Design a protein with these regions (language model features):
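Asp-based, Mg2+/Mn2+-dependent phosphohydrolase catalytic module
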Residues: 1-5, 110, 126-232
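Short, surface-exposed acidic
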Residues: 32-43, 75-88, 141-145
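Acidic active-site catalytic centers that drive phospho-/nucleotidyl reactions
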Residues: 10-12, 17, 124, 181, ...
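Active-site neighborhood of HAD-like aspartate-dependent phosphohydrolases
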Residues: 1-45, 75
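Substrate-recognition element of Asp-dependent hydrolases with the DxDx(T/V) motif
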Residues: 87-88, 95-100, 105-138, 147-151
């Protein structure tokens, strides 16, 4: 029986390590007083808050970037001057501009394409910012731009069901898989949408709590896991 399969990938902390980009940049400006994981979750929290305000039209995108940086540093007891904040943003962007797609991910995409699985990206964030990362990763080689679903463009953010339904309206399949690191957005959203979630934990480990969910620690585990789930 030939089922039509769609495999949807998150971007940040899935296709590259955003936590590493942040941590590398942070260490240029201060010595971390707390462990990397806690520091990153603080940054995530501050990023989400700033992005919410930007999405609601309360602040500009560049203000949201300044705010997430200054609040993260404040949380660890460091006051950054506005010059330092700008310097951090530039250093962060420079580090981000050097991200590459690992061979392992390329193999995943090649296998999916070989099996005629429809693959796509579903990511929360500002359109240009997310697109630049996808260009940097050279993603259009495997996933056409029409299948880059970015929350600002589709006007729906994971975990809202609208984001997942938007993908379904563009890609018809019998079974949808969501590959991502974030329990709140990727996993919860996928479960609500009746998709099959796979939590990707290589770069960012989040406790899935009582959610039943398959887990992949490395890209190479993803394809066999999809096969396994399909044959359950």
């Amino acid at each position: 029986l030939d089922k039509k399969i769609a495999v949807i990938f998150d971007l940040d902390d899935t296709l590259y390590s955003k936590s590493e980009v942040f941590f590398k940049t942070f260490c240029q400006f201060a010595t971390p007083s707390i462990d990397a994981e806690s520091l990153y979750s603080t940054y995530q929290k501050r990023s989400d808050e700033a992005f919410e305000k930007f999405s609601a039209g309360e602040i500009t995108l560049s203000q949201s970037h300044q705010e997430r940086v200054s609040n993260t540093f404040k949380d660890v007891g460091i006051e950054l001057s506005s010059e330092k904040i700008q310097a951090f943003i530039k250093a962060y962007q420079d580090t981000l501009n050097a991200i590459t797609l690992s061979e392992e991910w390329i193999e995943v995409f090649q296998r999916c394409n070989k099996e005629s699985y429809q693959i796509a990206i579903l990511t929360n964030g500002p359109t240009n910012h997310q697109k630049n990362k996808l260009y940097q990763l050279n993603l259009s080689k495997w996933i056409p731009e029409d299948f880059w679903f970015i929350s600002e463009t589709i006007q729906a953010k994971k975990p809202s069901i609208q984001a997942f339904q938007h993908v379904e309206s563009k890609i018809s399949a019998d079974e949808y898989f969501m590959i991502g690191d974030d329990v709140q957005t990727d996993i919860t959203g996928a479960i609500q949408a009746n998709w099959q979630p796979i939590q990707f934990t290589k770069y960012h480990q989040m406790d899935a709590g009582n959610l039943s969910c398959d887990e992949a620690k490395e890209p190479k585990e993803i394809f066999p896991l999809i096969q396994q789930i399909l044959h359950r």
